């Protein structure tokens, strides 16, 4: 169970880092070194890709756990399956909300008069 807590802690730290970067603060040495717009864009793109890959990986892991439980694997308990499914669901919902915020911000910028 401590592995799950440390995993949640690392996700929380990533979210706080991304929030600090979005608000203009410097959360990591990489962000401090990214002085040009292109470097910042690639950092943002790589962070988004890493987040989406993690969400996808969590979903695949949860699906694998569920299938293993269905076929009766002795080392997979119902508790593990339920926790993994909920973690995948929370990650997906978080990704969905980030997408909604990005689309909303894009629409706001596009409607600004020049």
From Swiss-Prot:
It is found in: Bacterial flagellum basal body. It holds the Pfam family FliE. Keywords: Bacterial flagellum. One of its GO terms (biological process) is bacterial-type flagellum-dependent cell motility. GO terms for cellular component: bacterial-type flagellum basal body. InterPro entries: FliE. One of its GO terms (molecular function) is cytoskeletal motor activity. Belongs to the FliE family. This is Flagellar hook-basal body complex protein FliE.
């Amino acid at each position: 169970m401590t592995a799950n807590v440390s995993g949640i802690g690392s996700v929380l730290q990533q979210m706080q880092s991304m929030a600090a970067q979005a608000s203009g603060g410097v959360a990591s040495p990489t962000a401090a070194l990214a002085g040009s717009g292109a470097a910042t864009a690639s950092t943002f793109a790589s962070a988004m890709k890493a987040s989406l890959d993690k969400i996808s990986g969590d979903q695949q892991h949860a699906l694998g756990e569920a299938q293993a439980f269905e076929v009766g694997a002795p080392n997979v308990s119902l508790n593990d399956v339920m926790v993994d499914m909920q973690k995948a669901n929370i990650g997906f919902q978080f990704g969905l909300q980030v997408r909604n915020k990005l689309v909303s911000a894009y629409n706001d910028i596009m409607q600004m008069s020049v």
